[in-house]
Amino acid sequence: MRTQWPSPAKLNLFLYITGQRADGYHTLQTLFQFLDYGDTINIELRDDGDIRLLTPVEGVEHEDNLIVRAARLLMKTAADSGRLPTGSGANISIDKRLPMGGGLGGGSSNAATVLVALNHLWQCGLSMDELAEMGLTLGADVPVFVRGHAAFAEGVGEILTPVDPPEKWYLVAHPGVSIPTPVIFKDPELPRNTPKRSIETLLKCEFSNDCEVIARKRFREVDAVLSWLLEYAPSRLTGTGACVFAEFDTESEARQVLEQAPEWLNGFVAKGVNLSPLHRAML
């Protein structure tokens, strides 16, 4: 039997770079919120202990894909602790809607959905803390998708505090370019000393993203989309880009702006949600 699992997008409602560690990683403060929009992971169990990704990504080797890595990591961790039923395996496919290099967390969300879904389907019984710890070894954004609640993040993104920001409507636009995260973080002009503030203070301030100035400078497509959106609503970059978003109080307002968008602007309307669609599906 094939089961389907949501793999939602996220937005960084704000993102501030507060420093850089000796190992090169940047410390930050950011606010994660999920969208009721994303990819769908399809899983069909098999009994021969094998993992097969049926929808490979061009240019990514099977064993290097985050989906496969997540499945194998869960398999090894559960087996090492005697919690993996004999023969546990899976065929996995993905209905992809989220762009790569878009700042919407697609790859991290896919990995988290696989961890949560296979832990349930294989009946391994690992806790959310264990799954989040495993997820962190796959990527800094994976734990927030595993835990499934909007969160204020610090450190390199792994220190999470659940929060409940307003669930607004968003017009999310993709400029048609992919931005590798290192391109932004290695830019010498990236702000790296934004003062650390409490979540209470940050929630009262106007939200912004320290990476936005670099993305707009280096990618004219990002600058063009943001310039257009800012004529209609508060708008900013998510993550390190390339996607940008405008926020609205109602769905109709967001859709009215999307209907006026020029032909070169590709976007969708989605609602911000504080409980991940993945976790809603498991209730």
Swiss-Prot record:
Family membership noted in the UniProt record: Belongs to the GHMP kinase family. IspE subfamily.
One protein family per Pfam: GHMP_kinases_C
Molecular function via GO: 4-(cytidine 5'-diphospho)-2-C-methyl-D-erythritol kinase activity; ATP binding
Binding site for ATP: P99, M100, G101, G102, G103, L104, G105, G106, G107, S108, S109
Keyword annotations: ATP-binding, Isoprene biosynthesis, Kinase, Nucleotide-binding, Transferase
InterPro entries: GHMP_kinase_C_dom, GHMP_kinase_C_sf, GHMP_kinase_N_dom, IspE, Ribosomal_Su5_D2-typ_SF, Ribsml_uS5_D2-typ_fold_subgr
Metabolic or biological pathway: Isoprenoid biosynthesis; isopentenyl diphosphate biosynthesis via DXP pathway; isopentenyl diphosphate from 1-deoxy-D-xylulose 5-phosphate: step 3/6
One BP term from GO: terpenoid biosynthetic process
Active site per database record: K10, D141
Reaction catalysis annotation: 4-CDP-2-C-methyl-D-erythritol + ATP = 4-CDP-2-C-methyl-D-erythritol 2-phosphate + ADP + H(+)
EC number(s) given by UniProt: 2.7.1.148
Record text on subunit structure and interactions: Homodimer.
Matches recorded under PANTHER family: 4-DIPHOSPHOCYTIDYL-2-C-METHYL-D-ERYTHRITOL KINASE, CHLOROPLASTIC
Protein name: 4-diphosphocytidyl-2-C-methyl-D-erythritol kinase
Enzyme class: transferase
HAMAP family found in the cross-reference section: IspE
Gene3D superfamilies according to UniProt: 3.30.230.10, GHMP kinase, C-terminal domain
Role according to the record: Catalyzes the phosphorylation of the position 2 hydroxy group of 4-diphosphocytidyl-2C-methyl-D-erythritol.
